[in-house]
Amino acid sequence: MTLKSTTWFPTVIYAGLNENVDRKFLKETALYWQSVEPAPTYSMNSNDGGWHSRSIEIIDAVEDKLKDGIVAFKNELDNSIEEVRKEIGFPELKFQNFWININGYGASHKFHNHPDSLLSGVFYIDIPNDNTSNIEFQRNDD
């Protein structure tokens, strides 16, 4: 008997470095946002010791002085999403929401999932050179 292999449940992870994003602006925006908005209580579900912004579904809800930079960032994300979408053959996708996390020394993210998401992503603005851990992915096939 000859066996044929097929891939049924792959886990594909895309990674890249986007040099078009103004990280300095995003870092300043994140720190400003943290200073004016306390972390919502639901953020304790996934963040341990850090700050987690509210979820941003509507760019127009962002303060005017931050909007241009956030829109430019979102446009870069949209370009990446479109590239992945075409490669894997998904129908047109719509960017749903994002949030900002700030984790200082000793803070971390708990394992969590993003239900009902076709794609999820992480964009690192600033990472110290030491005392940081790697991102981890788990797959629950139960």
Per-region residue spans from a language model:
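Generic structural signal for short, solvent-exposed loop/turn connectors between secondary structure elements
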Residues: 1, 18-24, 94, 113-119, ...
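Non-heme Fe(II)/2-oxoglutarate
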Residues: 1-88, 108
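A short, polar/charged loop/turn motif at coil->beta-strand junctions and beta-hairpin connectors
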Residues: 7-10, 92-94, 131
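Catalytic core of non-heme Fe(II) oxygenases with the double-stranded beta-helix
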Residues: 97-142
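A short coil-to-beta-strand element that immediately follows conserved catalytic motifs
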Residues: 87-98
